[in-house]
Amino acid sequence: MDCEVRRVILEGRYAVGVEARVGPYALRVRARATVVAGGAIHSPALLLRSGVDLPTLGGHLALHPATAVFGLMDEEVRPWTGTLQGHYSDEFADLDRGYGFKFETVPIHPSLAALAFPWESARDHRDLMTRLPHVALAGILLRDRDGGRVTVDRDGTPVVSYRVSEYDTAHLRRAIAAAAELLEAAGAREIWTPQSRWVAYRPDEGPGARARWGGRVDAAGYSPNDLLLVTFHQMASCRMGGDARTSVVNPDNQVHGIGGLFVADASTFPTASGVNPMLTIMAIAHRAARIIGAAL
């Protein structure tokens, strides 16, 4: 359905419903309770469009930045078939007060590989894609400590500002090095990163090959357009807490200072989670539903 909620209707310090567009038509829905669940990008944007004025609204956006290291195996892997996500490792999940990274196996469909593999020339890219059946990957999922921000432009469209901090980049560098070691131990005969330039090494290049490769990875860089980074989980832009100066919703998921207005999604996480967030999201929604239902 072509429907977009543009704002929450506030009467004084109380939410009484929402205003939406349905195709060319305007729609108003009045309700005793309004629950925002647009995710960590659109929930803060909706609250900002509605005139909610809290100092941390849209801030602290966490993304679980993710990348991978690839390895070419002698045997056929066919990374697009079989169990989609069957293994993970939390060996490095707590490098510093709960922050670190996880390894996860994820499928590499040809379209995704074409996006992630470095581009040197059409011929090189074609040759690399023909080797895809023999490619394995170590997926990296970073628990980011230092977040970004969601704002809105003049039309109310969400605008995301995010850059991986020096602190989180240090964990990213360690993750890439550890992923290469993992693939090497698994038998990879060539290992590379999804950077904008071809940065690879072969374990048979002799002692110190991986360390020399690490220097070239650093030289290729970790900034935007240097390294392919994706986000699977957006969190913490309407974070929960007891103080309106440092959070957006209270422990009952109600927006500070506004009656009848609640947020129930991953944006209410106080920080990035240390694991995939789906169970926590469901738990938050279940608890919020019980609290709201009891109050109506």
Tell where the protein language model's regions lie, with residue ranges.
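Glycine-rich loop(s) and the adjacent beta-strand/alpha-helix scaffold that form part
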Residues: 3-8, 16-88, 265, 284, ...
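A glycine-rich dinucleotide-binding beta-alpha-beta segment and adjacent secondary-structure elements
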Residues: 4-11, 189-271, 278
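Generic recognition of stable, solvent-exposed alpha-helical segments in well-folded globular domains
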Residues: 29-30, 38-45, 56, 167-174, ...
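Generic, well-ordered alpha-helical scaffold segments in large soluble proteins
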Residues: 37, 49, 143, 175-186, ...
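Detector for glycine-centered tight turns/loop "hinges" at secondary-structure junctions
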Residues: 13, 24-26, 155-156, 253
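Short, acidic Gly/Pro/Ser/Thr-rich loop/turn segments
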Residues: 43, 145-149, 247
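A conserved FAD-binding loop/helix module that cradles the flavin
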Residues: 271-292
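FAD cofactor-binding and catalytic pocket of flavoenzymes
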Residues: 54-183, 190, 217, 223, ...
